[in-house]
Amino acid sequence: MRILLFFVITFFTFIQLSAQTTRNLNSENWTFQQKGDSKWLKAGVPGSVHTDLMLNNIIPNPYKDVNDAKVQWVENEDWTYKTSFDLTDAERKAQNIQLKFNGLDTYTKVFLNGKLILDANNMFRIWEVLVKDFLKYKNNLLEIQFKSSSNEGKQLANLLPYKLPEGERVFTRKAQYQYGWDWGPRLVTAGIYKPIELISWSNFKLNDLSYEILKLDKNKAKVKFKFIIQSKRNSTTEIEFNQKKYSQKLTKGINHFSIDEIIQNPKLWWPNGMGEQYLYDYQFKIKQGNEQVSKHLKFGLRTIELLQEKDKVGSSFYFKINGIPTYIKGANYIPQDNFVSRVSKNDYEKLINSSVEANMNMIRIWGGGIYDDDYFYELCDEKGLLVWQDFMYACAFYPGDQDFLNNVKQETIDQVNRLKNHTSIALWCGNNEIDEAWHNWGYQKQMGWSKQDSLSIWNDYQTTFHYIIPNVLDSILPKSENRYWPSSPSIGWGKKESLTQGDSHYWGVWWGMEPFEMYEKKVPRFASEYGFQGMPTLETVISMFSVKDTLSKNSATILAHQKHPKGWETINEYMQRDYIVPTDFVQYNYVSQLLQARGTQIAIEAHRRAKPYNMGSLYWQLNDVWPVTSWASLDKLGNWKALHYQVKRSFENVLISVEKEENVYKIYIVNDLLKDLKGKVKFSVIDFNGNKRWINDKDVTILSNTSTKIMELNDEVLKGISLTKAFLRIEFESNGEKYSRNYFFEKPKDLALTKPTIKIKKINHNQFEISTNVLAKDVYLLDENNQFDDNFFDLIPNESRIITGKNIIKNLKIYSLYDTMNAENQ
């Protein structure tokens, strides 16, 4: 028995020794040092210089107080990280050992046992180096030197005969938002922000495994699995998956081959709100002699098309998913932290779940951030969130020297190969707002460029976004997956064509100071950016302070956590138009959130009513990098602002919406479901005491995937009713499902609200019933560290609602708009 056990253990060990193995070096004891300093300090990998300086109490938390200004010196320094590691017996016996650097930020020299093995210059590239010849069995010293990205960028800028806008950031392939944006601080960091892996193998290595859907119908799917294997010799390898075995001859070097798989009665993958997100999970075993590599591939079966078809006003811009024209509902996503290594799996889950709960089906990954972590895309695959993937270029012009272009090409290859298997990828987009910047932002005059300068800069733009990136996509992706859009938007918001073709970033509201109602007149074919600022939740505001302080709009900390130069001025101007501006800070915070939600609601509903002319609405922005007053609907702590609750309502598959045009109220039902809806619509004009002043009803049929005007209500009907004291209630019931909408005839500041008596009846530890005697407008439920299934809602008399919190309700406070409209309450 002992002899048998010894044989089994020995045989198992032999198999393991011969396999391709990967070891993460994160857990090694890392230290770091500022150039010119003799001290070595403890470091966390993955991480960044800033997080490590905080770890060692060298700098304060830049998210607190006005500390971001106090840590600007960090970006001008050079830094070195080091660790040592031993080889395992298995690694020592392997014929090949490779170091893989998944994320180095940014200008880096890597030394292994004193030998320079890598000179890196791109945060977004994946660097692989064969290191077998440089390794020892024990005490291998890995040292990584980081140069100041700011200083390096400035030196590169000086090599050009002309200046490019945005200074040094455009010369460095790193996250552009680190240099500061109008929603985030300037924190130009450095460090090992993704894992370093030690990969060992002997006779073969699996370099890549991907798939292509060759055929897909209701009866059968044909999928091609594509392998790239690196072999040290001529040999035969066996591939096993789905209880099938295949044999493949390999030659010495790089081998490309494929295997077709038939899937009977395929289950389709659908975006959120359209059906199931079914994912096939294939486990592959690749064997050669005693060596084996395992790899799993998870994918959904679906088709995606981007259609741009000429019509009488311009050209459409819409996505077809599995042959169905799909209305896109979602938001623009920025990195979740200035120091991205701090973003946890829980953070990703919380954000993606909040997006799904808000009825979104797409996220646009904005081009000034990062190509995000694999886990982000995995969650999008699982939850049905389509991804509009920008390449990482934003709001500036980039150089076109050969070194830079080679860097761009390899970055594109690395990231497309990394992300290509994700079912959720719907579109690859070259950049954010650079085409618009060229044509509309007046840089040619501002920067004093000559005709030759301008020609050179435009040619560089064309080379990157109309040649290099699309050619890389062509070389890697099958035609069915190669959907490329060179720049978003295609036409600037000041041009009339921006409303008749392509995608649009409409900033007449906010930047142009146009009223919210302009959203109803300026409806594009696909709205890929628009938005308005609002303050974060009170919990997040308090997190800005290192010590408890009086909350005030004039606080240095509050002012420092608003990065738009005219942010407060703009918010105040719009607030005066629509609300009574509170003097109390808590109430101002509340109303700023209502204002943001109101403006965005007007935009979303105008877009959706215009279906199929408009087929997409992506607001700016989903989330924040730090605690800040911004366009986000989710603040830095992941709390839902009023906007996110409103988005959830405005993105429901069935939406009742009202548009006022002169003296007529046009009532629509938008149906994104893939089935017709039949039922009765009830219309009521109700005063704020709950009395019905006018009623009507109508039987309707709302066809699937349409926007339908069901009624026009003339001002004549409303004669004798004070519109400052009444609202229109619309209720629709179909197949047991109920939908409703309250529409107010006047702006919030003009409503003649009376003080509501709001009653709470506890049901259990996190659930209660809420009711009121008169209209309670925009009811705000505030409980520390809690989120409710609905908030910032209208509570009407003679009705009650059941509200559920995610956590135990501890100290519930309730506000309504009435509290902000009376001097004694402020």
Predicted features along the sequence, with ranges:
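Substrate-binding clefts and catalytic carboxylate motifs of secreted carbohydrate-active enzymes
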Residues: 25, 34-35, 44, 177, ...
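Extended acidic/polar, glycine-enriched regions
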Residues: 135-139, 226-310
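Bacterial Sec-dependent N-terminal signal peptides
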Residues: 1-22
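Terminal connector regions
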Residues: 291-295, 716-754, 808-826
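Active-site-adjacent substrate/metal-binding segments within catalytic domains
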Residues: 60-87, 94-100, 105-111, 118-121, ...
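Active-site neighborhood of glycoside hydrolase catalytic domains
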Residues: 400-493
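Intrinsically disordered, low-complexity Pro/Gly/Ser/Thr-rich segments with frequent PxxP/GP/PP motifs
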Residues: 248-267, 688-722, 786-809
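Accessory beta-strand-rich segments of carbohydrate-active enzymes
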Residues: 25-28, 33-35, 76-205, 231-232, ...
